[in-house]
């Protein structure tokens, strides 16, 4: 099961993405992927906090998301496990890398049901693709994910996830997951 639930630009509902959007041309935007399980979004406030921080850092308008949980609980069955993706872009501000402060970019909300592998048995490999260091983007889920695309392509057959290191060889994240460790 997969669907785009809602898409809007400048506060107005739209039916298809706008190809002149800076998110398509420059990766000028952010996203959050959130697990929907048991009828609710897991760690919703943490995702909102990170999205708000990212919007501040990149100069994007934070979308109004007050009804998202209620809307999802109406369209998704309580027993479904799904990944909800929220995308926020800078919108259309003209050609070139520079942009004016946007009054509202493209915002897209979608979901896809998922099968999660047994959490006690996941094939993991260290990716040969190294993440570059950019302090201004650290901690943000920005739309330029080419390093992760290349890392996923480099995984051995049958391997579910790859461990991503930076250029100094330090553990940063999984290709598609967070990494936590305890001393």
Kindly give the residue locations of the regions a language model identified:
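Helix-start/capping segments and mature chain N-termini
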Residues: 1-74, 78, 83, 89, ...
């Amino acid at each position: 099961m997969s669907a785009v639930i809602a898409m809007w630009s400048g506060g107005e509902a739209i039916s298809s993405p706008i190809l002149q959007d800076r998110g398509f041309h420059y990766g000028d935007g952010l996203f959050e992927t959130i697990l929907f399980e048991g009828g609710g979004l897991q760690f919703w406030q943490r995702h909102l906090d990170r999205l708000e921080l990212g919007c501040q850092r990149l100069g994007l308008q934070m979308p109004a998301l007050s009804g998202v949980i209620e809307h999802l609980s109406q369209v998704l069955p309580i027993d479904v496990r799904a990944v909800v993706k929220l995308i926020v872009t800078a919108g259309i501000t003209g050609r070139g890398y520079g942009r004016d402060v946007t009054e509202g970019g493209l915002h897209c909300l979608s979901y896809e049901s998922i099968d999660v592998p047994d959490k006690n048995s996941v094939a993991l490999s260290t990716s040969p693709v190294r993440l570059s260091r950019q302090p201004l983007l650290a901690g943000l889920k920005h739309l330029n994910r080419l390093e992760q695309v290349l890392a996923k392509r480099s995984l051995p057959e049958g391997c579910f996830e790859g461990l991503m290191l930076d250029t100094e060889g330090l553990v940063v994240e999984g290709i598609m997951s967070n990494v936590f460790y305890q001393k």
